[in-house]
């Protein structure tokens, strides 16, 4: 049986079979030429095109930088190098070439040529040595597979017309470190043939030529030459490697308006962090008073927010946090509902904790005003037509009814002012009777809408300004003008509640305990000053507090006009005034 042998000449030192070029001739002889170390190529007589596979061996790149030549890539047919350093040869015999067929028939000459089994002797290169001392040389598992060449020859099938052409070159190139391991590809005349192990037994048709790449080749290619071309590898890396997540703050989160820390939602009307929310809540519930040790302009940020409690609380008010929204201890967990009545009146209730003064004033004002849904429009006329010679009795009686109906409501409001019920009983009556007409005008002007000509009274009755002319006389025109001026100042409910309280808590002639009244008045003034000074509107209007307090003398003038109207109606004697109005008139006359 003929034997095909490969004869080699002298090999340069350190050469290996991978650095030799094998060429098959028609005579059945093999010749080998050593290539230069710069271009190490393994030539096989398969086609005239080139099969390129990049190897991805990241561990080699670290230790091969000192070499001037490329390292040798061992094909799957080589056995593992002996570590003893001795030069030896290995003989591979009985290599059978199968599978060359055309339309299921094997040509005689091809069958005879490929049925020959020969002996090929390989001369291994010297064992590799590590350039780094102490680093062990690791061997790939493919060197231990001694039957890889045999399996390659038995499973490789190439269907092509004619004789086997010259072997093309297999180029083995070093891939950069980090290239992902993948199956190699074969290039035939500009086409790619994949050696992916997932497509077992796949056939590739190229210009009418079928190439079947079996599992052993794909396995060896995946083990020995794991890498795509650089273009495919870069695409694979871009598609598989996720980008690192950004470390920025979440988009659904903002910054605290007080200290600049992260704030997820709004608290008491302003987006603030949990720390500033709790600080503001505790301060309001305990009615705490702070003192600044500096010039009341301490910086308040995330790092220094705990240094000065006074400046921190003032900044909370400046950015717009509303103290009235904070629930007191008696309303905790009740969602703003009023506390229920005690089950048994005999049980003494525990003393209530200190409540914010301005919060109590706002609550008293809201409770004493009619709700929008309960307004009475039954007597409202948008364009009333009055005859000057009509009966005035009905309009005068309506005037008295509106005054008496408002009196009980305003008295109930005054009793809810913190500290008012603790005053002397005679002082309470004197303060209320002296300020009733002032409070009647002030509350009516704040509730009404002068632009539309609507007047909303304490009992919920809505009337047109023209409907009140016959009963109120010229006094109603002064009230409407005062209402327009009051609305132009854009007074919020907190400031108005303080102004209304100051209208009744003031110095009057004949007080039994004027000192206690003065102390209560100072508390309300300071509360109004703090609210106006550190409110957003107050900072832009430096004289805003003076304008608010200037409304109190105007109320005194309007009160005098009201007394004059009552006095005129008494003289007219068309309708006798109610006893309570008559007593009020006699007790409050300044002359």
From Swiss-Prot:
Primary localization: cytoplasm
Where do Low complexity bias regions lie? 8-22
Gene Ontology molecular function, alphabetical: nuclear receptor activity; sequence-specific DNA binding; zinc ion binding
Q: Which residues form the NR LBD domain?
A: 353-588
Could you identify this protein by its name? Nuclear receptor subfamily 4 group A member 2
Tell me where it resides: Cytoplasm; Nucleus
One GO cellular component assignment for this chain's record is: cytoplasm
- Role, per record: Transcriptional regulator which may play a role in the differentiation and maintenance of meso-diencephalic dopaminergic (mdDA) neurons.
**Which residue ranges carry the DNA-binding annotation?**
253-328
């Amino acid at each position: 049986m003929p034997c095909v042998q490969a004869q080699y000449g002298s090999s340069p030192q350190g050469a290996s079979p991978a650095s030799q070029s094998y060429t098959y001739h028609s005579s059945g002889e093999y010749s080998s030429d050593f290539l230069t170390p710069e271009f190490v190529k393994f030539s096989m007589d398969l086609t005239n095109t080139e099969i390129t596979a990049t190897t991805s061996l990241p561990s080699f790149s670290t230790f091969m930088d000192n070499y001037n030549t490329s390292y040798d890539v061992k094909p799957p047919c080589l056995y593992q190098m002996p570590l003893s350093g001795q030069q030896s040869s290995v003989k591979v015999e009985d290599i059978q070439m199968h599978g060359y067929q055309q339309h299921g028939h094997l040509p005689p000459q091809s069958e005879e040529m490929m049925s020959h089994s020969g002996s090929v002797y390989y001369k291994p290169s010297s064992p590799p040595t590590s350039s780094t001392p102490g680093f062990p040389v690791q061997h790939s598992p493919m060197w231990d597979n001694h039957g890889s060449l045999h399996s390659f020859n038995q499973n490789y099938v190439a269907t092509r017309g004619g004789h086997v052409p010259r072997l093309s070159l297999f180029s083995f190139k070093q891939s950069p470190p980090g290239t992902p391991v993948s199956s190699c590809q074969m290039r035939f005349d500009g086409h790619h043939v994949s050696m992916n192990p997932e497509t077992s037994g796949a056939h590739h048709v190229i210009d009418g030529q079928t190439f079947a790449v079996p599992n052993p080749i794909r396995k060896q290619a995946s083990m020995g030459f794991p890498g795509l071309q650089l273009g495919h590898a870069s695409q694979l890396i871009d598609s598989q490697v996720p980008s690192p997540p950004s470390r920025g703050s979440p988009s659904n989160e903002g910054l605290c308006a007080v200290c600049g820390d992260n704030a997820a939602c709004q608290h008491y009307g302003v987006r603030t962090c949990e720390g500033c929310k709790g600080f503001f809540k505790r301060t309001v519930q305990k009615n705490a008073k702070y003192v600044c040790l500096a010039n009341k302009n301490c910086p308040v940020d995330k790092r220094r927010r705990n240094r000065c409690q006074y400046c921190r609380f003032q900044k909370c008010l400046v950015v717009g946090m509303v103290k009235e929204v904070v629930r007191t201890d008696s309303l905790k967990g009740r969602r703003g509902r009023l506390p229920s009545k005690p089950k048994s009146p005999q049980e003494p209730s525990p003393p209530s904790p200190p409540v914010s003064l301005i919060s109590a004033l706002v609550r008293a004002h809201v409770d004493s005003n009619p709700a929008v849904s309960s307004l009475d429009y039954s007597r409202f006329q948008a364009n009333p037509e009055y005859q000057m010679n009509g009966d005035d009795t009905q309009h005068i009686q309506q005037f008295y009814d509106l005054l008496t109906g408002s009196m009980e409501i305003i008295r109930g409001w005054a009793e809810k002012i913190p500290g008012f019920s603790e005053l002397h009983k005679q002082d309470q009556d004197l303060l209320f009777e002296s300020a009733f007409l002032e409070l009647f005008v002030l509350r009516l002007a704040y509730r009404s809408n002068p632009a539309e000509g609507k007047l909303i009274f304490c009992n919920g009755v809505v009337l047109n300004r023209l409907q009140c002319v016959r009963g109120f006389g010229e006094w109603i025109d002064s009230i409407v003008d005062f209402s327009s001026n009051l609305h132009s100042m854009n007074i919020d409910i907190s400031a108005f509640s303080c102004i209304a309280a100051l209208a009744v808590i003031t110095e009057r002639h004949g007080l039994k305990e004027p000192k206690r009244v003065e102390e209560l008045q100072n508390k309300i003034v300071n509360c109004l000053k703090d609210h106006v000074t550190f409110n957003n509107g107050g900072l832009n209007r430096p004289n805003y507090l003076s304008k608010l307090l200037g409304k109190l003398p105007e109320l005194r003038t309007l009160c005098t006009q009201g007394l004059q109207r009552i006095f005129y109606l008494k003289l007219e004697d068309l309708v006798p005034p109610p006893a309570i109005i008559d007593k009020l008139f006699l007790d409050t006359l300044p002359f």
